[in-house]
Amino acid sequence: MIFPEEDYVSSAKSMGLTSLAISDFATLRGTPEFVHACKKANIKPIVGVDFLIDELLFTLYVKNENGYKNLLRLFTDYHKGLVTLDNYASYTCDLIVVLSITSPKFKDAFNSDKFNYWLVDVQRGIDNFYLGIAPDKEDYLYHIQVREFAVSHTYKTVAFPFVQYLKKEDAVVLKMVEAVSENKPLAIKELEGSNYLLSNDEMLVHYTEEEIHATNEIADSVDFNLITKRGKLLEYKNDLGMTSDEYLHHLVRLALQKTGFIRRHSYVNRAKYELD
């Protein structure tokens, strides 16, 4: 995302959406802010993470507390290089798995004679499995073929747009960010793209009723609250007569003072956010 999470949630709210998903690549960094923004706007947050496994793009969404634990286990092993196409299904209990059809490896597999057998192996052991359809005018025929295959082989497809910015004209902002990060000049001042937050009417243009229904099916199946206490706070013994919670706050403040970050509001606010 190139805009704050609150902006995405606000736009979704204005469109009448009642649920919204996040899935950053191999990280949960933006998730807490996203969830807080959704709660404030009375929108149901769907928590997920993108993983590239053997050159295939998977998005895993949390169904419940057990699914969250499995996601963290997968997350840990993924960053250790231990997750492969052969074993990833063992992590997916109480997770919703969406396989993107846009990756080159998926397209190559789809064009092979053994695609059906290949996809059976990829999906084996997964209870909640969908093929993610992203709007793509250039690959319109390919999308039709994937949909036809899914119907004939009883796979579920789901509306799965790739959202990077809020409006189509915001594509130029993404180019600006890329140019700055690469220290390159940007000649263009206007640009429209396709990776924006689609309106309800636009969703109906790009997707079937079944694919839109599948998004609601996923949202309805989720019963998870990220913002909750898990386990017990460690007991911090001290000579100041403070409770463990008070002493932890005290130690964090001392650390901020020692490093000089006490003078930077962003660090202080982040510390308060984590402690609360």
Can you annotate each of these PLM segments?
Residues 3-19, 41-46, 50-135, 168-276:
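Conserved active-site carboxylates
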Residues 156-169:
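Short acidic/histidine-rich active-site segments
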